[in-house]
Amino acid sequence: MERNEVAPGMLLVAAPDMASEDFERSIVLIIEHSPATTFGVNISSRSDVAVANVLPEWVDLTSKPQALYIGGPLSQQAVVGLGVTKPGVDIENSTSFNKLANRLVHVDLRSAPEDVADDLEGMRFFAGYAEWAPGQLNEEIEQGDWFVTPALPSDIIAPGRVDIWGDVMRRQAMPLPLYSTFPSDPSDN
């Protein structure tokens, strides 16, 4: 299978047999990729914490379910905001957005919510992030732990009932769609 390159706005899709329990059935959106580091947030791990309890000023822009997501094991006291802009928004000239891909943006949470409200279709908030040292992610991809694929805006603001991992797997070339219903515990099969 052809391998996509890691870049901001790309997804890391955990292989069905990934050994790490921290990233089992995970989808990580890459926010930064450079020779020094790669970091992103797990967009598929919702917590029981309401955004209203942590960032009440951002609730109106938060897509349902309005829960804080667990972005990764590092710096869980830090919150990352991701958004999907409305069609036609000039992302390149915005001081509040860092473009990741098409309409996907990393939102500067120092901005006032009312300053970005007209530009956003929806947002998600993530406590913590995942980070890889130089060469570490490439090694994990070569071992078959991750597949790399482009993100869609719907991946970020998907309703709570959506199995994001399964949906992303179904979009891939064969044989990956065959694993889209792979249970987190194979003994459940």
From Swiss-Prot:
Annotated coiled-coil segments of the chain: none
Transmembrane portions of the chain: none
Matches recorded under Pfam families: DUF179
A GO-annotated cellular component: cytosol
Gene3D superfamilies per the UniProt record, alphabetical: VC0467-like (3.40.1740.10)
Similarity comment: Belongs to the UPF0301 (AlgH) family.
HAMAP family membership: UPF0301
Protein name, per record: UPF0301 protein Cgl3084/cg3414
Organism: Corynebacterium glutamicum (strain ATCC 13032 / DSM 20300 / JCM 1318 / BCRC 11384 / CCUG 27702 / LMG 3730 / NBRC 12168 / NCIMB 10025 / NRRL B-2784 / 534)
